Amino acid sequence: MSAQISLNPMATTNAYGLFQTNSAGFTQGDALDDPSVKFFLAGGVLATDAATPIWGGIPIEELIAPTVYPPPAGSGPGSNLGSTVTQAASNAVITGFSVFNQAYGGITTPQSTAPLYSPGMSVNYYRLGSGARIPLLIDPALVSLDGSIITSQVSWDFAANKIIAYDAGVGALKVRILKISTSNNLTVNYDGMTGNANWVSGGVLAVCLI
């Protein structure tokens, strides 16, 4: 028996019944705040021939800025609007990832609650090598990577728009996985039949350094 008070200052929690807010979890495509990389945020225009709209957390292919919009011919401020971007169709052409950060022009409706950016609209993104940390959708089976080295190889499923186990036929995605979050996340569910995209609570996200 001891007269000393036992205290573990690291075992903290919220008291019950205080209407507390839990700040755990991430939002797909919403890059984490970082003063050292915020000025690397880039903007461009989604290609007019893009097959689908785009949203945050999607690998993009950046093309050299055209002299006029819409490319390849037309009139307008041209390269002042930034590069032309489109959804990357293969691992070899991924140049960055789209994000929701400061992208206030996304279209939402009562039936489509996640912001979507149509061909010709402005899209914000971070390039590979920028050092941005972006939450990306990941296959729940890859929770098994917890505790592994951050350079563990993974691939991207271009149909399901998520990180999957490494596939030599697809190639390694050029990201480092810093953290995998399994709860309190917001992910985007895009329905190709209706063209709607909605927020889904509870998906699995990986915070990726690009």
Predicted regions and their residues:
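Surface-exposed, low-hydrophobicity beta-strand/loop segments enriched in small/polar/acidic residues
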Residues: 1-210
